[in-house]
Amino acid sequence: MAEPDRAAPVVVAEAKEVEPTSVPRVLLTNDDGIESPGLRLLAERLHGSYELVVAAPVRDMSGSGTGIGRFDNSKGIELRRASWNGIVAYTVDGPPGLAVMAAALGAFGPKPALVVSGVNAGVNTGHSVIHSGTVGAVLTARTFGSHGLAVSLAYSDPWQWESAVASATKAASWILGHRGRPMVLNVNVPGLPVSEILGTRWADLDEFGYFRVAMADHVEQLLQFEISNRPTGGQVEVGGSEAGRNPSTDTALCHAGYVTMTALTAVEPAGRPEVPPDAVIPMPAGGATLRSV
């Protein structure tokens, strides 16, 4: 993956800088589960270049966002060691956000400098990334002061895993060369052979994403959704519109054949709403009121 054409601001919350080491420590996770070929292939490529630990869900946890699941002090969460030809790997009975939190708190050794999530089978573009376990894992990493890299691959038959792995390894090296505050990058790779990829572009988040979701029906005890991700007439339907409408978005650029990079932020304060200094927000009956100070 070539260096991006232009710089884009990376806005991050206050956190300590990640200290560079001679051999950076990297955590690899995903939301497709420990058996995903994208996870295994990326682990094999990263192993040897970094102090790598793999910790991934025991089953598919797609759509888990930044969730960590439900747990309490009286019960432990199952963690099993896997044998991966010299690669340290664990299965976690929970979503990827939980694996990242555990790593940040020392479950697998020192906190990683970088958390890589992927390679996801299917793109993660647009504002719908908030629901993605792949992206949620790296947003969780950022809240703990680590760099985060989410890598997703567009569908093709056969899957072009090599293209995604090649892009991921270059992006990981690029991020770890960053000496500022931790950053989060969301990378989407087109389902093309490496030789056919047009290049790398910084991209804006699309309004929706590659998938179009609609409410098909609902009754008293059932919600039925309709999900579509098939290109139509050479364009991708995105929330009822064409991806080509805004060519600078991650959905459109990836569909056109580019590897896309989008900088994301973790949760941070948004600042006080713009209200008059004497504005009062009414609280529930019997309570107090909130007044600007």
Feature annotation, model-predicted:
Residues 32, 60, 95-96, 120-123, ...:
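Short glycine-rich anion-binding loops that position phosphate/pyrophosphate groups of nucleotides
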Residues 163-293:
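Electrostatically charged, flexible surface regions
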